């Protein structure tokens, strides 16, 4: 099986069961640089000089 393909329809997000939404409970903050393949897409707002996390992913 080709690992570069996805089983779902292109351009349509998968439905999630809201009752079984994933959460991290009792986790710990990671040191900067300890997970170099992880990315965080953030939006910077000038009016309050803050960044907001939008989504994340991993570099393959």
Swiss-Prot record:
Biological process annotations from GO: acrosome reaction; activation of adenylate cyclase activity; proteolysis; single fertilization
Catalytic activity: Preferential cleavage: Arg-|-Xaa, Lys-|-Xaa
GO molecular function: amidase activity; D-mannose binding; fucose binding; serine-type endopeptidase activity; serine-type peptidase activity
Domain Peptidase S1: 24-60
Activity control mechanisms: Inhibited by SERPINA5.
SUPFAM superfamilies: Trypsin-like serine proteases
GO cellular component, one term: acrosomal vesicle
Keyword Amino-acid biosynthesis: no
Glycosylation-annotated residues: 3
Keyword annotations: Disulfide bond, Glycoprotein, Hydrolase, Protease, Serine protease, Zymogen
Enzyme Commission code(s) on record: 3.4.21.10
Listed InterPro entries: Peptidase_S1_PA (IPR009003), Peptidase_S1_PA_chymotrypsin (IPR043504), Trypsin_dom (IPR001254)
UniProt record similarity statement: Belongs to the peptidase S1 family.
Role of this protein: Acrosin is the major protease of mammalian spermatozoa. It is a serine protease of trypsin-like cleavage specificity, it is synthesized in a zymogen form, proacrosin and stored in the acrosome.
PANTHER family: ACROSIN, ACROSIN-RELATED
Further comment: X's in position 19 to 22 were introduced by homology with the pig sequence.
Subunit details: Heavy chain (catalytic) and a light chain linked by two disulfide bonds. Forms a heterodimer with SERPINA5.
Protein name, UniProt field: Acrosin
Species this protein is from: Capra hircus
Primary gene name: ACR
């Amino acid at each position: 099986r080709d690992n570069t393909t996805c089983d779902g329809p292109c351009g349509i997000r998968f439905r999630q069961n809201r009752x079984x939404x994933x959460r991290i409970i009792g986790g710990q903050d990671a040191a900067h640089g300890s997970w170099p393949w992880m990315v965080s897409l953030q939006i910077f707002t000038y009016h309050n000089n803050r960044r907001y996390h939008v989504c994340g992913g991993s570099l393959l």
